[in-house]
From Swiss-Prot:
Protein name per UniProt: Arylsulfatase
Reaction equation(s) it catalyzes: an aryl sulfate + H2O = a phenol + sulfate + H(+)
Organism lineage: Eukaryota, Viridiplantae, Chlorophyta, core chlorophytes, Chlorophyceae
Similarity comment: Belongs to the sulfatase family.
Domain of life: Eukaryota
UniProt source species: Chlamydomonas reinhardtii (Chlamydomonas smithii)
Details of cofactor binding: Binds 1 Ca(2+) ion per subunit.
Ligand binding (Ca(2+)): D35, D36, C73, D323, N324
Chief location of this protein within or outside the cell: periplasm
Length: 647
């Protein structure tokens, strides 16, 4: 090679090195995202999750007032990645037609959400584990636009603790004798090693199914009926004997275990029987099995050690959270989620990383309200892309991490004068207990909730509006367990202000979600709930018509949900936006079913280059045999019992 050529190569190498160095100044992100983990019933206690505290909480911070807004997996995961409430994504259920993989794609969510926004900022993105329930054996060839390397779990294997996973559209693999959380841990660690080797900033999400129930889909050979069966979570073999002395925390501040008097609760809750001793004993064991299944704690340790050995730990944000909360034995319930009560809405959120002051404490060091819709704006801001926040139609705002700034948090990280002190939650559909078969399902569990929290006084209020238009109001400072519905006894000013907030937040979009006071008080005189309680505003709030439902529906229909602010916030025809509920005709259902069957028959694996690092567990993996895969496709069709579900 001539001297000139050598010089040219050297120059190119120098430019590449400088570019690489500049690129790596951006922080990395590792998100560990569990399934159905509560923040109320002590699941994150250091006795049960010591690594969570050692490796994330003590060198970072826990947000004590962190909530989901739709407490069920797939809509909540969509809120997280899109930064929008479910009434703005119109992704409102786990399965079609109101949720599911096809609706996720049909709404265009996979065309514009957090992983793709980060890729546009020069990031590699990685994903392994639970994705959407309806991402299944019938459609796995359609690779989620979620990452450089994407390894989502595939239904009906998603909630099998002997898991199957696929990689970038290839046939799902079985991992004989391997435990789900261990497989996801090993593959997540391998992805991190691959990400570091690639030399670009990265976002890696690791989503174990724990501590979700173990779920099987089976066909009764005698009747031909296919249905799902829920069982308590299955711990890893070494963990079966752990925490045998653990009991449900009935003596906690909430004190709502097996609530005797539910006369002030909605009619459908009053219809639930009080748990008898045999069911209480069973629920105690469910609780212990949930604790024993928290293998993600070991995952945390492996992730931190991998980042440390790679020399990137100090430039990496590590986040731990869950898709929704969970209750065992609260009120009259058995085990599950989907209600508007605290057990289901509150989830853990812990973070460490550059710019965040170490708490070095067992006590939460940040009590600013945070929501899943705030997650995407937070990541963008930490990644140096806060300039994008106004371009993505986000309902959320960055989390209050500025309260824990060690002086090196990005200078453009938003620091609002007034942090969010109120939010809304919502759910559409029925209620059923996951594990107590004696509790009858209830069809009318569609609801909205508005919740406030004043960081200085610790005062919190909650108003729940059921689709039957029954109301519940709780003073959360005096009654954190939501035992005493004071709707008829509360001061009129408190009730009217909460009704006013709900009327705005139930239909909010964009800025009105984080700052409803701008709608209620356009002159800017009121910026929080405490100020709104001033008697001089009584006439304003007494004139506001309460939010109501016309009837109970299992889906979002703007004509069914009435607020006097709907036109002001959403325009004259809100159904024309993303929130449109599109009914399918019989002809379109048949066409969709035909197309889906054709797609499900495709067996050719997508071409894909090997990862830089392969998890050792891959040595044991084998593809799911085609005859079993075909049978499972038919089983999944039969389970859904409506062909357009798989559209």
């Amino acid at each position: 090679m001539g001297a000139l050529a050598v010089f040219a190569v050297a120059c190119l190498a120098a430019v590449a090195s400088v570019a690489h160095a500049a690129d790596t100044k951006k922080p990395n992100f590792v998100v560990i995202f569990t399934d159905d983990q509560d923040a109320i019933q002590n699941s994150t206690h250091p006795h049960y999750m010591p690594s969570l505290h050692k490796y994330i909480r003590y060198p970072g911070v826990e947000l004590s007032q962190y909530f989901v807004t739709t407490p069920v997996c797939c809509p909540s995961r969509t809120n997280l990645x899109r930064g929008q409430f479910a009434h703005n994504t119109n992704f409102t259920s786990v399965l079609p037609p109101y949720g599911g993989w096809a609706k996720w794609k049909g709404l265009g969510i996979d065309q514009s959400y957090l992983p793709l926004w980060l890729k546009d900022q020069g990031y590699n993105t990685y994903y392994v584990g639970k994705f959407l329930v309806d991402y299944s054996v019938s459609n796995y060839q359609q690779v989620p636009r979620a990452g450089t390397i994407s390894m989502p779990x595939v239904t009906p294997y998603t909630f099998d603790y002997n898991t199957r996973l696929q990689r970038n559209g290839a046939t799902p693999n079985i991992y004989p004798g391997e435990y789900s959380t261990d497989v996801i841990r090993d593959k997540g660690v391998a992805q991190i090693k691959s990400a570091v080797a690639a030399g670009k900033p990265f976002y890696a999400q690791i989503s174990p199914i724990a501590p979700h129930t173990s779920t099987q889909i089976s066909t009764n050979p005698a009747t031909g009926v296919t249905r799902s069966y829920f069982f308590p979570p299955i711990p890893a073999p070494p963990h079966w004997q752990l925490f045998s002395d653990a009991n449900l925390p009935g003596g906690s501040x909430n004190k709502n275990l097996y609530e005797v008097d539910v006369s002030d609760k909605p009619a459908w809750i009053r219809a639930l029987p009080l748990a008898q001793q045999n069911n209480r004993t069973y629920q105690e064991e469910i609780y212990r099995l949930r604790l024993r299944s928290l293998g993600p704690d070991e995952l945390i340790e492996q992730v931190v050690k991998t980042l440390d050995e790679a020399g990137v730990l100090d430039n990496t944000y590590i986040i731990y959270s869950a898709d929704n909360g969970y209750h065992v034995g609260a009120h009259r319930f058995g085990a599950g989620k989907t209600t508007g009560y605290e057990e289901d809405l509150r989830v853990p959120f812990l973070i460490r990383g550059p710019g965040i002051k170490a708490s070095k404490s067992d006590k939460p060091q940040n009590s600013k309200v945070g929501l899943h819709v705030d997650f995407a704006p937070t990541i963008l801001s930490l990644a140096g892309a806060s300039h994008l926040l106004g371009d993505k139609g986000l309902d959320g705002t960055p989390l209050g991490l500025y309260a824990n700034d060690d002086g090196t948090l990005p200078s453009d990280y938003p620091r609002p004068e007034q942090h969010r002190q109120q939010f809304q939650g919502e759910f559409w559909g029925g209620w059923s207990d996951e594990l107590l078969q004696n509790l009858r399902s209830q069809p009318n569990n569609t609801w909205k909730v508005v919740r406030t929290y004043d960081e200085s006084s610790k005062q919190g209020w909650k108003l729940i509006a059921q689709c039957t238009n029954e109301r519940e109001l709780y003073d959360l400072r005096k009654d954190p367990g939501e035992l005493y519905n004071i709707y008829d006894k509360a001061k009129p000013a408190v009730r009217s202000r909460l009704e006013g907030l709900l009327a705005v937040l139930a239909v909010c979009k964009g800025e009105s979600c984080s700052n409803p006071w701008k709608i209620l008080h356009p002159d800017g005189t009121v910026k929080n709930f405490t100020q709104a309680l001033n008697s001089k505003y009584d006439r304003i709030y007494n004139a506001i018509r309460p939010f109501t439902y016309k009837r109970c529906l299992p889906y979002l229909d703007w004509d069914n949900e009435d607020s006097q602010f709907k036109t002001q916030i959403r325009g004259a025809n809100p159904a024309a936006g993303v929130g449109h509920h599109r009914l399918l005709t019989a002809a379109s259902e048949r066409a969709i079913a035909t197309r889906r069957r054709a797609q499900a028959a495709v067996s050719a694996e997508l071409a894909d280059g090997p990862a830089v690092f392969q998890a050792k567990v891959e040595e044991k993996s084998v593809p799911v045999p085609q005859d079993i895969l075909k049978a499972d496709v038919e089983k999944w069709f039969a389970f859904n019992n409506a062909e357009y579900y798989l559209a």
